[in-house]
Design a protein with these regions (language model features):
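Helix-biased detector of long, well-ordered alpha-helical tracts
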Residues: 1-133
Length: 133
């Protein structure tokens, strides 16, 4: 199985942003009962106007996180872009007879939330100046 996730920063700390991006990307594999194996980084970062050390911290946070879970970084791609974005394409393995999907949900199933509902909406509102932290 393969998945791709990348997004703009949702926290101010570059290292934490890298960690969150890595977890968000490999979580898609875990959510379907798979095992993440390899990842490729995708980053959009401006060539001018932003300290390159910030990208280094983003990458360090992401790499330490994927390594923690046994995922091997095998490559990636970067794009010169005004808006910083970061994430991973993750390849995993899964038993085709044990794939967990949203379509299999039933009334009475237990839902496990890993963050508060509405976090993404609030984060977007803060970025657009429509909400405060």
């Amino acid at each position: 199985m393969q998945t791709l996730d990348f997004f703009t920063p949702i926290v101010d700390d570059p290292y934490d942003y890298g960690r969150i991006a890595a977890l968000n990307s490999i979580n898609d594999v875990w959510a379907m009962a798979g095992t993440p194996i390899t990842a490729m980084a995708i980053t959009c970062f401006p060539k001018k106007g932003v300290d390159p050390a910030i990208l280094g911290e983003i990458m360090r946070g992401g790499l330490e996180t994927i390594n923690k879970y046994g995922v091997t970084l095998i490559g990636g791609h970067s794009v010169d872009n005004e808006q910083i974005m970061f994430g991973y394409s993750v390849t995993g393995i899964i038993d085709p007879n044990k794939v967990a999907t949203n379509s299999g949900a039933q009334a009475g199933d237990v839902l496990i939330l890993t963050k508060s509902i509405g976090t993404g909406v609030i984060s977007t509102g803060i970025k657009k100046g429509c909400a405060s932290d």
